[in-house]
């Protein structure tokens, strides 16, 4: 929270974007002159005024009022304004690529104007050179993105982690809505937290529990992990970066430990990866998309299962340390062109751009059962007794004619609520169904569980989860005839584990709902 407050104060003084141009006094008067409202203009989307008044922030339909004052926008030559602040990982490569292709597909020219190292503006023009939009970027950190939003200096936040409870509370108090709702946050692309070491380090895998012990200082020598008798040197991004905070939230906090003192901090992802690559005794946690010359470790458990980050394991969320890239959108109207850009980020062309930019896209991929040998081997290994073998046979008979979609669903730890990536998957699958991609096909939502507790109970829980996800997708479909696609459910409980059940991490990976198609 102290970093949030510091960033918020900094935002009040440092962030100067096109949004600040609106901050002038206006008077909105009804056309019959009977009603008058004065205040500071915060924004105009071409149809609605957003004004800070003595009654609080109000949104007023421009068709019913006349605007007077120095801050009044032009109604005939309206320019859509949007400011975007947050993670440099997202803002330096991915968002510019999406803006440029979005402009091209809409017959617009995109000109990038660089103001300094952290500020740039995209000006979108028609063929007649008329300016129709300005998208202003501030690329810094996830922390500062949320601070800019709270300071009313940003319309969108680029984040490498989920919003924290303190930020969520402040946003609600500021009237920005519940930012972890499905309509207030969306996954732009996928990434993962990857444990990295030097290429000469003999270690090839590590458990998440051991990672937490290393980061907290409980393990300080590589010999404990099967390596050389030498001290471990820890490298991390700066404390305000999204990846460092994601490690804190999802690794350290869940293990009830804190990062040890004496950690080597780095200002950029590239510097972090190179420092670890050059340090034979070093270890760090980096974005999957920016491992560089370092070596990425697999995640393993005591039962022998191991998971390595790659495009498919990140898409399916089988790799437990996925790190979605978020856009957070406050509860306010954006200009029409800005809303169209946000809709574009979920399209198939946008997924292609995302992959070309070096990130993991959200486009579903189909995987045959024959291509899942490791999973089947795990299933055979844990099949226990006649009941276990019978369930495994039913699984193979049922799923052999189908293909697994990379779209999967998992839940928040200890909750029935879908996690952030899965909530985005609900929307992605619903949009695909609306587009007719699965017309004439069968989609089966298949539930799996961990191996804790009685098998019958696990099978029942897995079936209930599959039914809940199917219902969530059906409810998210807004403009489609569901009779064109067959939606069913099934469940196999603990029959096909992905990870060891002796840790909370492994159990969370195993509790899932997959989608299989025919």
PLM regions and their residue ranges:
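Exported/periplasmic ABC-transporter solute-binding proteins
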Residues: 25-438, 463, 467, 471, ...
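Sec/Tat signal peptide C-region and signal peptidase I cleavage site
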Residues: 18-23
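Short loop/turn segments at strand-loop or loop-helix junctions that form parts
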Residues: 411-412, 445-450
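Positively charged n-region of N-terminal signal peptides that target proteins for export
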Residues: 1-5
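Periplasmic OmpA-like peptidoglycan-binding domain that tethers envelope proteins to the cell wall
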Residues: 126-130, 139, 144, 448-518
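Bacterial N-terminal signal peptides
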Residues: 7-17
């Amino acid at each position: 929270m102290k970093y949030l407050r510091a960033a918020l104060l900094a935002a009040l003084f440092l962030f100067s974007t096109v949004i600040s141009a609106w901050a002038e006094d206006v008077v909105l008067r009804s056309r019959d002159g009977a009603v008058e409202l004065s205040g500071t203009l915060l924004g105009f989307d071409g149809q609605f005024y957003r004004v800070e008044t003595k009654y609080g922030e109000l949104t007023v339909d421009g068709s019913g009022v006349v605007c007077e004052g120095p801050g009044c926008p032009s109604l005939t030559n309206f320019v859509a304004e949007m400011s975007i602040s947050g993670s440099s990982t997202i803002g330096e490569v991915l968002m510019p690529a999406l803006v440029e292709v979005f402009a091209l597909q809409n017959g617009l020219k995109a000109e990038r104007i660089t103001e300094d190292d952290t500020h740039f503006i995209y000006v979108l023009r028609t063929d007649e050179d008329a300016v129709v939009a300005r998208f202003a970027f501030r690329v810094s950190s996830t922390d500062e993105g949320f601070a800019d939003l709270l300071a009313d200096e940003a319309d969108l936040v680029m984040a490498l982690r989920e919003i924290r409870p303190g930020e969520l509370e402040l946003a609600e108090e500021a009237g920005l809505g519940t930012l972890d709702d499905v309509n207030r946050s969306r996954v732009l692309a996928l990434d993962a937290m990857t444990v990295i070491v030097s290429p000469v380090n003999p270690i090839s895998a590590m458990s998440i529990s051991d990672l937490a012990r290393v980061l907290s200082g409980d393990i300080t020598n590589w010999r404990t992990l099967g390596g050389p008798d030498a001290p471990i040197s820890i490298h991390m991004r700066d404390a305000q970066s999204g990846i460092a905070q994601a490690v804190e939230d999802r690794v350290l906090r869940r293990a009830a430990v804190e990062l040890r003192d004496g950690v080597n901090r780095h200002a950029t992802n590239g510097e972090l990866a190179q420092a670890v690559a050059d340090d034979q005794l070093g270890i760090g946690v980096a974005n999957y998309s920016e491992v560089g010359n370092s070596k990425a470790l697999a995640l393993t458990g005591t039962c022998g299962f191991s998971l390595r980050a790659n495009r498919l394991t990140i898409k399916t969320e089988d790799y437990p340390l996925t790190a979605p890239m978020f856009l957070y959108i406050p509860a306010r109207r954006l200009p029409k062109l800005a809303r169209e850009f946000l809709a574009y980020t979920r399209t198939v062309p946008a997924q292609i751009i995302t992959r070309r930019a070096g990130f993991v896209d959200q486009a579903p991929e189909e995987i045959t059962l024959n291509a899942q040998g490791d999973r089947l081997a795990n299933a055979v290994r844990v099949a226990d007794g006649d009941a276990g073998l019978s369930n495994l046979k039913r699984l193979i008979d049922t799923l052999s004619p189908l293909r697994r979609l990379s779209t999967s669903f998992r839940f928040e730890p200890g909750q029935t609520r879908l996690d952030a990536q899965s909530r985005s998957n609900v929307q992605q699958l619903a949009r695909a169904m609306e587009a007719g991609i699965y017309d004439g096909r069968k989609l089966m939502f298949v539930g799996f569980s961990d191996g804790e507790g009685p098998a019958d109970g696990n099978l029942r829980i897995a079936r209930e989860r599959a039914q809940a996800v199917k219902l969530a997708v059906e409810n998210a479909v807004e403009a489609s005839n569901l009779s064109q696609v067959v939606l069913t459910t099934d469940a196999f409980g603990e029959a096909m584990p992905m990870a060891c059940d002796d840790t909370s991490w492994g159990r969370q990976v195993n509790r899932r709902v997959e989608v299989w198609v025919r």
